[in-house]
Amino acid sequence: MKTKLNSSNMQLLLFVFLAWDPARLVLANIQEDEAKNNITIFTRILDRLLDGYDNRLRPGLGDSITEVFTNIYVTSFGPVSDTDMEYTIDVFFRQKWKDERLKFKGPMNILRLNNLMASKIWTPDTFFHNGKKSVAHNMTMPNKLLRIQDDGTLLYTMRLTVQAECPMHLEDFPMDAHSCPLKFGSYAYTTSEVTYIWTYNASDSVQVAPDGSRLNQYDLPGQSIGKETIKSSTGEYTVMTAHFHLKRKIGYFVIQTYLPCIMTVILSQVSFWLNRESVPARTVFGVTTVLTMTTLSISARNSLPKVAYATAMDWFIAVCYAFVFSALIEFATVNYFTKRGWAWDGKSVVNDKKKEKASVMIQNNAYAVAVANYAPNLSKDPVLSTISKSATTPEPNKKPENKPAEAKKTFNSVSKIDRMSRIVFPVLFGTFNLVYWATYLNREPVLGVSP
């Protein structure tokens, strides 16, 4: 009985499989036919759209103004060059407008196309007013996107890298802030033909990727948008402006310039604590610190454009240079008023000893001559010879030697100028630093936003 049931089940499964397989094949063929039909439909739609389409003429020519809605997505911002006053930015530049000639009806509401279709239709002739160099990426294919909605609305996106000018005012350098503009608009069409409009508000029309900053010396706190109209000999044109706000980081310059300047000034003031007679040591301190400040001032200017005004760092270096040079002038003044005298107060004792030794030598020489003259008579008379041998040789009267006075080294007293400088110089330098840093660090950054 069980055998009969199993065989019937197997027959049923085989029947279902044989019945389903043709149905599956039929369904696959239907889907394939639908795909082919869709491709055929879209091909016909595109052919119909381009049939009689003149991409030399803007939409609404003679009837209305073409409105181009724009927004920017920044994928990479930086680097910023202070010497050239320019910056580099990598963006997805998006433009949207409506072309009544490209309306269509089909199974889909949006046609997603690539750059090949973009070259066959009218697109805005947008260019960057302050761009020095612009590159449209073409690897591995041109990085362009085109979408056409059924109502004729087009979305055109390009990936661009732009080197743009960034005017900088460096009076507060390195505590400065800047606003780098990105200006763009139509090259040929005036405001009566084509106008540009930001798609969203300020925070959404220009967006920066979270990891898009490529800045070592700046922070990018935010951005803003604007719009203006400029006049030229050929008409009025709409100019869209996106401002990128930059705030410089001061840490690098504190380590590279400010701390060495402060340490050099402190080193120059060490000479006030040396004796006024230490001319070589104090000269080395003065000359070395002056040369060090000169080197620091030159190196600080190498990273800046050759502007005709003084920056905040220039003022700091100039004041430090004045302190160092004043320390050298102070030593010259002290040295000029230093009294000149013998270095040892035992000189008179030394001279007396030399005179005493000279008189003893003269007496000894006289006695030796007298003995030599009397010697022949002594040899003739044996009695006198015996007496002379037994006689003691007279010695000159010597004064008891007094212990020479101890030679003590004498110094001039500490100069009043040095005493005053030990207090005045540090106090003045500390006051200057307090005023300088309080002024610049508490100052609100002024962003030079161009209209």
From Swiss-Prot:
It comes from Bos taurus. Belongs to the ligand-gated ion channel (TC 1.A.9) family. Gamma-aminobutyric acid receptor (TC 1.A.9.5) subfamily. GABRA2 sub-subfamily. PROSITE patterns: NEUROTR_ION_CHANNEL. This is Gamma-aminobutyric acid receptor subunit alpha-2. Activated by pentobarbital. Inhibited by the antagonist bicuculline. 4-aminobutanoate binds at R94, T157. Alpha subunit of the heteropentameric ligand-gated chloride channel gated by gamma-aminobutyric acid (GABA), a major inhibitory neurotransmitter in the brain. GABA-gated chloride channels, also named GABA(A) receptors (GABAAR), consist of five subunits arranged around a central pore and contain GABA active binding site(s) located at the alpha and beta subunit interface(s). When activated by GABA, GABAARs selectively allow the flow of chloride anions across the cell membrane down their electrochemical gradient. The gene is GABRA2. Residues 1-28 form the signal peptide. GO terms for biological process: chloride transmembrane transport; gamma-aminobutyric acid signaling pathway; inhibitory synapse assembly; synaptic transmission, GABAergic. It is a multi-pass membrane protein.
